[in-house]
Amino acid sequence: MDEILKQEMQKELTTRILPYWMERMVDQENGGFYGRITGQEELMPRADKGAILNARILWTYSAAYRLLGREEYKEMANRAKRYLIDHFYDSEFGGVYWSLNYRGEPLDTKKQIYAIGFAIYGLSEFHRATGDPEALMYAVRLFNDIESHSFDGLKNGYCEALTREWNEIAFLLFSNSEVTSLIFFSDSGW
């Protein structure tokens, strides 16, 4: 990669992108991270918190810590890991909840394999960056949950969404944002 481009990208990452989330999105009152900020920079402190956002924050700051070695990135990653395990992880049935309310209480308890996959990515990267055995243990647990509850041997594939107790959902409606994601990924060849 061109050295100038690499330096510009690293500067953008370390002076704008990573600090943005550290300064604006940490929920000091209820734990974890705020679930929403508008395009006009209006924070929505009572917005629901999603597993995917938390897991992406975990992966991002874990990777940033691994590559750049800054302690504040490790602290952000650890905050995301703790919140994922303490609030999103379903200690009774395994997997992670799709969403929590702003206070960190389960809201939508269905098991979305997409969200569990992101949790595995984040926890695995945290383990890679820090050697943390707890992160690895939960990543393996979540992987095993997918294999034991989502794999359909008859169809040789995986069920995307299940109830909290890992039962099939007969009819699943997607939100507008979920439909947009599905359209983007199917149209882009992902």
Name each region found by the language model.
Residues M1-W190:
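Glycan-recognition and catalytic cores of secretory/periplasmic carbohydrate-active enzymes
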